[in-house]
Amino acid sequence: MYFMIEHVLQTQKEEKFLKPKKMYVSTPYSRVQAVEDRLKVIFEEEFKSEGSILIGYNPSIISKLAKYLSGHISKPASIGIAGETASGKSTITLDIIDTIKSFATEFEIDDAVTRVNTDDYYYDRSDMVKAAGSFSEFAKNYDLDVPQALELELMSSHIKQLLMGKAVYLPKYDMSGTAIRYDNYTLANPSKIIISEGLFTLTEKIKDAFDFKIYVDVRSEVQKERFFVRAAERDLGESANGIYENASKKAEIYVRPCKFEADIVLSGEAVRARYKAFLNKLIGIVQQENFKNRLIV
């Protein structure tokens, strides 16, 4: 398990223990080290800035990220993003994907990013919904807020196949209240980055499928307010209270502990443009290291 630090180590002993190892063999030291030094500055400045997107990060992620961005590691990378409901993880994920796609379009990079949606791996329970008479009646006796409600082993297998360069047919779960899962629904091609987000994306059965683990954190009062705004939009009525209480209770058991598995903890409350701005700084390193003769207009 990774132990998430909140940026500044309190003792020299801790600093020595958590200091990332530098193992650069085939790539010139100067190149990887230069990227790592730039990343340290980028992370440091962002963390210290007002309204930062960063709550904390494991120092070892700097070294690992440097190897990917410098080209020392050229294989595809997988990113897992987790957080409670209404934490902002879906919005952040979409912004990451949009930023990567914009860069890929500018530099004519094919197969830049593939999204694997965690929610699509809920088990098909359509027969149970029909037997109950409605989804709301079904949900009274079936808990969707636990990782056991999803086929995470299948999701892990699909991600690993994509990372090995194999195309995979992904499932599609109907979120409209039928609890139908359509298997082999969407063809996903392998790409340079595989990204997934969901409540249980960093839980035990799936976390090892990801090279980079991100947790999106948010204050409870903000998360609760967002939840009930969304509940009103979905016309959940009085049932929203029970749904929220169950989701919060199960998050305490299954979701919040994932924060301590994460390489990076992001704030789900930062100004949206700042996530893209931070990512563009990382992309700037990729541009300099791999596209030195091509400038973004």
Task: Please report, for each region that a protein language model flagged, where it lies by residue.
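Hydrophobic anchor at the beta1->P-loop junction of P-loop NTPases
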Residues: 81
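NTP-dependent small-molecule kinase module
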Residues: 2-75, 208, 228-232, 249-297
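Glycine-rich phosphate-binding loop used to anchor ATP phosphates in small-molecule kinases
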Residues: 151-208, 255
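Conserved nucleotide-sensing/catalytic segment adjacent to the nucleotide-binding pocket
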Residues: 114, 121-175
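Hydrophobic positions on the alpha1 helix immediately C-terminal to the Walker A/P-loop
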Residues: 92
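Conserved lysine of the Walker
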Residues: 89
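The conserved Walker
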Residues: 85
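Conserved phosphate-donor/acceptor-positioning beta-strand/loop module used by diverse small-molecule
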Residues: 208-228
